[in-house]
Amino acid sequence: MLFGYLVGFLAADPEERMTSGGKRVVVLRLGVKSRVGSKDETVWCRCNIWNNRYDKMLPYLKKGSSVIVAGELSLESYVGRDGSPQASISVSVDTLKFNSGSSRPDARGSDEGRQRANDNVSIGFDGESLDTDSALDKEVYAGFGEDQQYASEDVPF
């Protein structure tokens, strides 16, 4: 199993579909920017959200939204419009979060819309609820605000 984290922008609003077996899936088309040499490239990924996961977030996911996705990655092949073989990345989404570090101001929308999006929306890992107003105002990471003292023998290399 290949597991990965992707950070990117939605290329379109989420699409809700039903499989032939009657299972519900919401598809996100995610553009992930990467730099190859001096050239920027965008890798397009299809992110599948199965069943009713993240339903509270879906009304706030719009084209241009910056998101963080974690899940099982798979590579799929298909024949392009010109007849040449192509490859795409597919993600079975385990975790979906809004990316508060978005560099696109239009992706967030108005302050009122952002406030509605932050109200009681489960956006954390394993469905934990976060106080997004305070999280947007400060950097939060492991050990944030703690005074760390390391001795040279603590470093393993």
UniProtKB/Swiss-Prot annotation:
Gene3D superfamilies per the UniProt record, alphabetical: Nucleic acid-binding proteins (2.40.50.140)
One cellular-component annotation, GO: nucleoid
Pfam families the record matches: SSB
Keyword DNA-binding listed: yes
UniProt-listed GO biological process terms: DNA replication
Domain SSB: 1-100
Family annotation (CDD domains): SSB_OBF
Residues covered by region (Disordered): 99-131
An example molecular function term from Gene Ontology annotations: single-stranded DNA binding
Entry keywords, A to Z: DNA-binding
Ranges annotated as biased composition (Basic and acidic residues): 105-117
InterPro entries: NA-bd_OB-fold (IPR012340), Primosome_PriB/ssb (IPR000424), ssDNA-bd (IPR011344)
Keyword field contains DNA-binding: yes
Quaternary structure (record): Homotetramer.
Protein name: Single-stranded DNA-binding protein
Species the sequence originates in: Chlamydia trachomatis serovar D (strain ATCC VR-885 / DSM 19411 / UW-3/Cx)
Gene name in the database record: ssb
